[in-house]
């Protein structure tokens, strides 16, 4: 089960709409309690993809290292990554699957014509295929 604090969800949506028509990206921070992952904050990062950023995103290894450091210094867990799919549904592509790390949550936001159209979260299963995560409604901190 994935729970997202309302403020974190609002920040992801704002980032995704502002980046349109490009894909935005960032990190999910929070904590794990039993089988529940609770996203308490996000951190937007620069889409490091060279060239056309409308259909692809990339997070630099430097940003990953800084995110791990930030999580450790703030007693948080790095739970995963979010990114937007401009004018496409919130379903992972094969490129998303190939770049995915095990145990991470991957939130995809669908932005259609500069409007938020929905979000879904995914995790790799044992066969390295994406499965949709169950989510609770946005929660207040």
What does each of the following model-derived ranges do?
Residues 81:
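Conserved, mostly hydrophobic/aromatic
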């Amino acid at each position: 089960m994935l729970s997202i604090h309302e403020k974190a969800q609002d920040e992801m949506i704002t980032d995704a709409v502002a980046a349109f028509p490009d894909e935005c990206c960032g990190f999910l921070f929070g904590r794990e309690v039993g089988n529940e992952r609770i996203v308490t904050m996000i951190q937007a990062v620069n889409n490091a993809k060279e060239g056309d950023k409308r259909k692809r995103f990339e997070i630099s290894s430097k940003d990953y290292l800084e995110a791990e450091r930030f999580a450790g210094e703030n007693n948080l867990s790095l739970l995963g990554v979010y990114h937007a799919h401009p004018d496409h549904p919130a379903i992972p592509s094969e490129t998303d699957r190939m770049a995915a790390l095990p145990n991470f949550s991957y939130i995809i936001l669908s932005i259609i014509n500069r409007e938020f159209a929905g979000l879904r979260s995914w995790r790799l299963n044992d066969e390295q295929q994406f499965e949709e995560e169950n989510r609770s409604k946005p929660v207040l901190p």
